[in-house]
């Protein structure tokens, strides 16, 4: 029997990263405020986890200004979408595994 645990991506072990990627998979782009509201986490938690996902190439970060107001938005990259899809598939296989 294949060990599906080994196919899970460690980048998505955190429930926060799992939440971030889940939101980004169904939205083209999400801004900081929306992500914070949806996940109910602190600014520091968002920044820390986004930074980790960005370093892996799974998330792109866009910073811009609307007038004088800064706006940061996030999107899943192609690599991020592929990695997250594989992670979800591994979870599904694990759930469907019979004894």
Where does each model-flagged region fall?
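Residues within the DNA-recognition helix of helix-turn-helix
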Residues: 49
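Amphipathic alpha-helical dimerization/coiled-coil segments
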Residues: 1-5, 22, 81-99
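Glycine-centered, phosphate/nucleic-acid-interacting loop/turn motifs that mediate DNA/RNA or nucleotide
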Residues: 57
């Amino acid at each position: 029997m294949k060990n599906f645990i080994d196919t899970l991506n460690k980048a998505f072990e955190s429930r926060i990263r799992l939440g971030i990627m889940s939101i980004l998979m169904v939205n083209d782009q999400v801004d900081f405020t929306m992500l914070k509201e949806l996940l109910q986490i602190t600014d520091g938690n968002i920044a820390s986890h986004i930074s980790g996902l960005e370093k892996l190439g799974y998330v792109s970060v866009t910073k811009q200004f609307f007038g004088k107001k800064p706006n940061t938005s996030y999107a899943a990259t192609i690599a991020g979408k592929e990695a997250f899809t594989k992670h979800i598939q591994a979870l599904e296989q694990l759930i469907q595994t019979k004894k």
